[in-house]
Amino acid sequence: MSLAGKKITVHDMSLRDGMHPKRHQITLDQMRDIARGLDAAGVPLIEVTHGDGLGGASVNYGFPAHTDEAYLSAVIPELKQARVSALLLPGIGTVEHLRMAHALGVGTIRVATHCTEADVSEQHIGLARTLGLDTVGFLMMAHMSSPAQLVVQAKLMESYGANCIYITDSAGHMLPDDVTARIGQVRDALKPETELGFHGHHNLAMGVANSVAAVAAGANRIDAAAAGLGAGAGNTPMEVFVAVCDRMGIETGVDVFAISDVAEDLVVPIMDAPIRLDRDALTLGYAGVYSSFLLFAKRAEAKYGIPARDILVELGRQRLVGGQEDMIEDAALTMVRAREVAA
């Protein structure tokens, strides 16, 4: 099937998911510079918050260089055409955080839950719609549910008022056929006017291929990040995805060379380490582990001497999900004790 002429919305993750590899330490000036570049390149939606969403500043998730309010207040006035979104995970972010974001000018709220827990999003989705926001239901770790199970959860979020549903490959575990099955069945089940999106990670180097598969299956919003700046091996690299779309005739409204310049000149220089598919990031995708667990596992390796890869495989075996970051150190300690007993 030709996708020529299909119009999609590209949603930038560099300033939210990109907070994870930066340990939430992006400066206000860096935020402004990158946001202005994205805006000038034609990116229509830019997400700005702590990596774990509004209210994410904590011992469990990490303390950012600045508050969500400061980041949003720095970015929003700089933009000429792009709109700003914010992520909110019920249980981390509250309705008061949502009201704050709305008051500052955020136009899109993405309410994120584990892929089996859409029911916890009802209050936040309902309030967002009442406030007149573009309201997205964001089903994380979607590889852990079958297409039929995702349909049930997506329809719940739609019933609460979400005007867009996201299928989210938080672990970068899916292959194109997995994406096609999930996006296709959810698209068939939702109202025609409800939009559908896909969020990918590059842990198996499938970010671009999976995003194209999502578009072919009916998604019209796609997440990506300049230079792939995001958790694990990064999000779908936007400059590559936009170039592929351009080759295929998919209309993104984003200038290929301008977004490449943003990636090369603004994003790459702020990286603490290259965003690449090393053995630990590959293990995330292979074992189906939440991408933001990567640095937690690397820190546990440095502390306890257990290879991060072994820790990540164990986390995958335990089927840990986002929000269980405190269990990573527990798993490492258990592995240390087991090795001491075996010695």
Curated annotation (Swiss-Prot):
Residues annotated as the enzyme's active site: 20 (proton acceptor)
Entries under SUPFAM superfamilies matching the protein: Aldolase (SSF51569), post-HMGL domain-like (SSF89000)
Binding positions for substrate per the UniProt entry: 16-17, 170, 199, 290
Catalytic EC class: lyase
InterPro entries with a match to the protein in the record: 2-IPM_HCS-like, 4OH_2_O-val_aldolase, Aldolase_TIM, DmpG_comm, DRE_TIM_HOA, PYR_CT
Positions marked as site (Transition state stabilizer): 16
EC number: 4.1.3.39
Protein name per Swiss-Prot or TrEMBL: 4-hydroxy-2-oxovalerate aldolase 1
Cysteine pairings via disulfide bonds: none
Pfam families in UniProt: DmpG_comm (PF07836), HMGL-like (PF00682)
Sites where the protein binds Mn(2+): 17, 199, 201
A biological process from GO: L-leucine biosynthetic process
